[in-house]
Amino acid sequence: VVIPPVNDNLDSTMQAIYKNYFVDFTPFKSEPTCATKLGEIPASWSVCKFCDLCDLLNGRAYSQEELLDSGKYRVLRVGNFFTKNSWYYSDMELEDNKYCYPDDLLFCWSASFGLYIWNDVKTIYHYHIWKIDFSKTAPYYREYIFLYLKQELNKLSKEGHGSVMAHLTKSGVENLDIVSPPEEIIKQFHNSIIPFIEHKKLVEKEVQQLTELRESILSKMVS
């Protein structure tokens, strides 16, 4: 089952709203500006490092012997974002930060690159995925960081796959310069984007259910 184009439209709309806020600064044109290393920004804003706003948490690496055909927890690997019907499992009890939970922001950084808001049950995530932690700020920064990183990935992708590989290290991402708006602007942006995120999650759930139904029907036909 292919995810319908409605999700592409939702992504495009969210990116357009992000650009309006944080690239063109359209709602803030009446405010004085100041010069920074990232160009002119509203004077009440600042520039900081990515790691000042959030942390990248590493997943766990697994030996083949640790990956089971069934078990208590699924193990989320990069490939599962593209072929969700092929899973490994684990019975291991790990530190809490080695699991992803509904609404966590995940960043695939090896071979295939992408950002995903987790839309499923408690799951172990693999070493080639970072979970983005917002303990330094607040959960409502998620939408800003999600779309900021999408923009950065798009820039690097235009330069070619090698450029993405060269820049997409943990320290490289942590040391990215990022505009830091006042917290009330982040809250306002969150409130603008969250309806699109929730709609996207509903579409993904429907696709998942249709995929599972198809697999069940095909399995019965074969047997």
Model-assigned labels for residue ranges:
Residues 77, 96-154, 159-162, 169-173:
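A short beta-sheet element
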Residues 34-35, 48-66, 71-104, 125, ...:
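Sequence-specific dsDNA recognition surfaces
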Residues 87-88, 119, 190:
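Short conserved micro-motifs at the rims of enzyme active sites and ligand-binding pockets
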Residues 20-26, 36-39, 60, 73, ...:
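Flexible, active-site-adjacent loop/turn segments at secondary-structure boundaries
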Residues 1-61, 179, 183-223:
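Non-catalytic DNA-recognition/assembly elements of restriction-modification systems
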